[in-house]
Amino acid sequence: MDSAIEISSGSDSDDEVPPQPVWPQTRTRMDPTWLSRRPLPTVDSHARAEHTNQAPPNGASSDTSRPGVSKPFTGNGNTVNSRISSGSGADYVRLSSEQALKRTLPPSFNSPPLPARSGTNNISNASGSRVGVDYERPLSQQALKRTLPPSFNPPPLPSRSGTNNIRNAGGSRFGADYSHPAVSAVGNKSTFGDHYSGAHAEIGIQRGVNGVRILPPSLTHGTSASVLHHAGSSDPMHRFGGGEDRNPDNDERLVYQAALQVLNQPMTESDLPPGTLSVPLMRHQKIALAWMFQKETSSFNCPGGILADDQGLGKTVSTIALILKQKIVSQLKSESSCKQETEALVLDADDESDNAKHESGSHVKPELKVSSNSETSVLSACGNDENDSSDMEKAEDEEANSSTRAFQWKRPAAGTLIVCPASVVRQWARELDEKVSEESKLSVLVYHGSNRTKDPNELAEYDVVVTTYAIVTNEAPNKFLVDEDENDEKNTDRYGLASGFSNNKKRKVVVGASKKSKRRGRKSTNDTSSEPDCGPLGKVGWFRIVLDEAQTIKNYRTQMARSCCTLRAKRRWCLSGTPIQNTIDDLYSYFRFLRYDPYAVYKSFYSTIKVPISRNSCQGYKKLQAVLRAIMLRRTKGTLLDGKPIINLPPKVVNLSQVDFSVAERSFYKKLEADSRSQFKAYADAGTLSQNYANILLLLLRLRQACDHPQLVKRYNSDPVGKVSEAAVRRLPREARSRLINRLESSSAICYECNEPPEKPVVTLCGHIFCYECVLEYITGDENTCPVPRCKQQLARDVVFSESSLRNCTSDDSGCSSSHDNGLDRSVFQKRDFCSSKIKAVLDILQSLSQPDSPNSAQHGQMPSSSRPYDDDDVTIVEPMRLHSSSPSQGAVKTIIFSQWTGMLDLVELRILESGIEFRRLDGTMSLAARDRAVKEFSKKPDVKVMLMSLKAGNLGLNMVAACHVILLDLWWNPTTEDQAIDRAHRIGQTRPVTVTRITIKDTVEDRILKLQEEKRTMVASAFGEEHGGSSATRLTVDDLKYLFMV
């Protein structure tokens, strides 16, 4: 039987211990190089060391001034001064002056036997047992017990007066809880805690090809011999926001090892048993399934990742396959564990068993076992990511952890939570139903609407729960960590740092309750409903959370992004075809959600990613590629697999159609542009650009809208809330009306939901500004609470007011008419027969598609760029037309028309009605049922030829392969949003070539937006190491990785 050395040492001063005999040469730990100078002997992994008890040489004595006390033992007869170090380098020598240290050391130190002494030590270390180190008690009152695994083959202790019964069962793990690193590795900056998280982890020692055991880097002075098994983020050091006291170099070494493993591993595929899915997996989806399953079950400290496949490549099906595979494996594991005799792992404060029960579908709580099967063993030990622990718990003192663990055990263990935009909730439900065979059906709950359940136990009964970001925002625990420097814009600008970063401030907890209420909350752990400001979603311990269209949380400062981070889960996934939309900062929000250390803390993210990019963009982007390689899988439609495209789709042709203004439109635009430029210069001269940022965005918004139609600038149809709003306004005191008007006219009038200047702006009774389309998502039954952090105002139509209704009622009370006018002279553009240049271009395209024999139709409806300006009188009403396909067997040609502004869709709708074209519409003002009905009718009814879509509501997740022509009426700041809209039609299932027409106006702000889009495309391509075609432009080599991580 393997044995472990147990060494007891007192903490008295060195003067109290008599000097050791001459034969052991005394060394102190003050010389950290002594161990590195001593070569480590090779350990035979197949031999059991058997030693006989030996007595020390004559003259050697172990007596001390106190019975049973000796100096710490190094394993070779040498003694060292005990020094306990925290992960941040704190010295606890004085704190440990009265404690006894018990340590077990590996046999590589070649320890001679201890001298005899009195006393009896009976130590039993069962397999997987952990040392009961209580860090809540003073160090002076406890003994630190540590047990090394039997793989170190320690020699037995010498005979002493008394007996030493030492048992260390095979397969034992490190007994110490290394989530509180107490002993630094001698001669190395790394600590045990940097490479082992102790709780729930298997031994991180690997066997080489020749059978020789490979020590971890902390014992080999930084030499990485293999990719270590690393447990999940169960310890506080790995918890959300807990990386600042650690050395990020140690975490980066793990990232390097993971990236190296990905680089060296051949591409593998995985499939489900026949009959599990109703559709076969494509090869690239099999590769995605193998990669995702490996990411969840590997020992890397980030159980999950980012699936960043291009839109339309089947990320949804790959995710469904992952859910099914985990369920199948859990069922097999549960069945095999009942037949095999294994030793249970002691999982500290972990509900993995409950989650395994849920995944397997069994009502009997299976006991987690260590199986001889390698895959099953990994499944049992990994994934205990203890991401269950909320950010609040990271900041609480250790005394509260015991009650927190009790609280965790009360949480219902649920399956997979899928968070997605409201527009694709129904589609996820359909995919989960249609893509899974009858024999393998998953139980699915659409958690949406005002009548949804309030019982978290009911959520735990389903395999999959589908909900929206809005509901998560309101039901997630209302407590989170924030950077104090996030609002410290002046300091970051002053020192040349990016907004949201500070190099000397630490994270703090922002909680609505006071310290007293937090203390009361700790005691109230008997009921899951006792957690304050938390809905059912926040009271469940999820096995897996999947964020679909994860770019929704790209702004890490938003309440939505924070809420997703505070949910408890074992595995975490981000699905996004466009993970970077604006800046590299978009990635930080994903890293924080995924608990991807060390980049989950903004300070580390800034110093290790953003700073290198700013200093040397080429090397900086290569470093970013390596960081992403460990957690991200990305394939585009142009990616090659064995020399062939991963998917065969019809071609996509993108045409840029530049038209010109009419005379009246050009005159209007020039005056608006001159006024805007003059206003901007005034801000610049006064040095108030930053204070007037919202006003500057509004100036740009008006210029962009003028390119679509002048009436948009004049606030066409500017009172969206109508008579209900006016009736509610009349009940408000006059002072309240004035206050709300001032809020709408404020320079900070930015929509709280989309962070853009509001279209059809409205103000709520609580004083918050929204686009009408954005706030309607909350009014129409999804979640009627104001989404602004810590605002609990219930939203309804009678508490949302437009500017016109506020002013009209105010002017009526004063007995005078309102002097406020919505715009400039309306005489030209209010004519019913006026048609803007862009709308004319749209009608021309539809006209060409209605004539199958025309040249334009032969080119899939391509419309040549217009260079002739339209005159005011050049207005034609298009005769009623029917859209036909050049190939009768393919059916009618269907078109999607996108615009950012619902006002523009209103104007286009009027002209399409006059032309007699059957159409449907989808925007954010519609209920989910109405949206779903519009999509079905557009896809199924041959007579419906056109779909009008707002970019906000229609660019995410929808499957619109019935259309083969896409028209973009206006440009968005980042091109990825447009790409997402286009890929609603160009995706798996499309059988015809897709033509895209982007309509712009010459010599306007849109020319400059096009240039900005190209710059952003270049930035995204650099971050992913891709050329514009999607192929890899810069292949990282092993030498690249070593250089980037300074290994």
From Swiss-Prot:
**GO biological process terms on file:** gene silencing by siRNA-directed DNA methylation
Query: Can you list the GO cellular component terms from the UniProt entry?
Result: nucleus
The reply to whether ATP-binding figures as a keyword in the UniProt entry is: yes
Q: Where is the composition biased (Acidic residues)?
A: 385-400
A molecular function GO annotation? zinc ion binding
Annotated region (Disordered) at: 1-89, 103-130, 145-174, 349-407, 511-533, 851-873
Q: Does the keyword Nucleus apply?
A: yes
Basic residues: bias regions = 511-523
Q: Basic and acidic residues: which segments have biased composition?
A: 354-368
User: Which ranges are annotated Polar residues under compositional bias?
Assistant: 52-88, 118-128, 370-379, 851-868
Keywords of this protein's UniProt record, alphabetized? ATP-binding, Chromatin regulator, DNA-binding, Helicase, Hydrolase, Metal-binding, Nucleotide-binding, Nucleus, RNA-mediated gene silencing, Transcription, Transcription regulation, Zinc, Zinc-finger
Q: Origin, by domain of life?
A: Eukaryota
Describe, by residue range, where the zinc fingers (RING-type) fall in the chain: 751-790
The UniProt annotation places ATP binding at D309, D310, Q311, G312, L313, G314, K315, T316
Per the database record, which ranges form the Helicase ATP-binding domain? Answer: 296-597
Where does this one sit in the cell?
Nucleus
List its EC numbers: 3.6.4.-
What are the residue boundaries of the Helicase C-terminal domain, all occurrences included?
887-1042
Could you tell me where the Low complexity compositional bias lies?
1-11
Q: Which CDD domains match?
A: DEXDc_SHPRH-like, RING-HC_CHR27-like, SF2_C_SNF
Q: What does this protein do?
A: Probable helicase-like transcription factor involved in transcriptional gene silencing. Associates with SUVR2 and contributes to transcriptional gene silencing at RNA-directed DNA methylation (RdDM) target loci but also at RdDM-independent target loci. May be involved in nucleosome positioning to form ordered nucleosome arrays on chromatin. Associates with SUVR2 and functions redundantly with FRG2. Required for the efficient methylation of a broad range of RdDM target loci.
Give the family per the record. Answer: Belongs to the SNF2/RAD54 helicase family. RAD16 subfamily.
Summary of subunit composition and partner proteins: Interacts with SUVR2. Interacts with itself.
Protein name per UniProt: Helicase-like transcription factor CHR27
Organism (species): Arabidopsis thaliana
The encoding gene: CHR27
